[in-house]
Amino acid sequence: MSASLDLWNIPLRALNINVRKRLGLFLNPRNTVASDWMSVAENMGFSYLEIKNYEDCQDPTRKIYRTGKPLSRAQVGKLVSILDNVTRKDVVEDLRVLIEEDCKRYIERQNEPPVQVPEVDSCVPRTPERQGITLEDDPEGGIPELFDAFICYCQSDFDFVHEMIQQLEQTDHKLKLCVFDRDALPGSCVWTITSELIEKRCKRMVVVISDEYLDSDACDFQTKFALSLCPGARSKRLIPVKYKSMKKPFPSILRFLTVCDYPRPCTQSWFWVRLAKALSLP
């Protein structure tokens, strides 16, 4: 690692989804020669019974990363140290560039001047309201659950959302979608949770466009909030998906964005591949 980076002063939350996914690709497969996720779990202080219970998880590395209290409040340096201890320097070397980039971005964000002075900052509440808002969040405020994309949809289009889950999560794409009705816990302010998920937890947002979408206040808020985070679509953050033929005009605020047109026969065969690729970009 770069000598100019003090990894022991950079929290694990600085590492983005791509690094965490690659950790799983290296450590999830059971290996008789090299150490796998079980060795990492032992070094993190997990008991034998806990490790045995995680064996059935689809992504055990992600599971221990999220639930391991010794690691959840640790630094990037701690993770690198554990990988060294279990003789997985190959993982450290493969991820070195990505880890350094994430750490540098984190330091840059920390050094950026705030948009508002703290006395008038109304964007981030000083309460635990934004902690423990999804199914896999650490209730004690550890590493938050992160997603590849937030899905903006109205209730009448939920069948298409189910298909999206099947095509993008339950296939080789292995993307992680944030579906509000499935992933968000009840009991908190809808607007607070929604803004937190879109801005802090999800890399992108998929907007399911239909006539019913145009009548949804929730979809209107989510779309405008996401657009405000990426003026000019520089980060390709918002991806409109036209779900079915529309009688009403296409929303004007989205006309400057490239659309995934699901009902168009000539492109339907590669619809899911295009969408998955767009959501997989760094």
Curated annotation (Swiss-Prot):
Residues 100-141 are annotated as: Intermediate domain. Residues 145-279 form the TIR domain. Residues 22-99 form the Death domain. Keywords: Cytoplasm, Immunity, Inflammatory response, Innate immunity. InterPro entries: DEATH-like_dom_sf, Death_dom, MyD88_Death, Myelin_different_resp_MyD88, TIR_dom, Toll_tir_struct_dom_sf. Transmembrane segments: none annotated. One of its GO terms (molecular function) is TIR domain binding. GO terms for biological process: defense response to Gram-positive bacterium; inflammatory response; innate immune response; MyD88-dependent toll-like receptor signaling pathway; positive regulation of canonical NF-kappaB signal transduction; Toll signaling pathway; toll-like receptor 4 signaling pathway. The intermediate domain (ID) is required for the phosphorylation and activation of IRAK. Adapter protein involved in the Toll-like receptor and IL-1 receptor signaling pathway in the innate immune response. This is Myeloid differentiation primary response protein MyD88. It comes from Oncorhynchus mykiss (Rainbow trout).
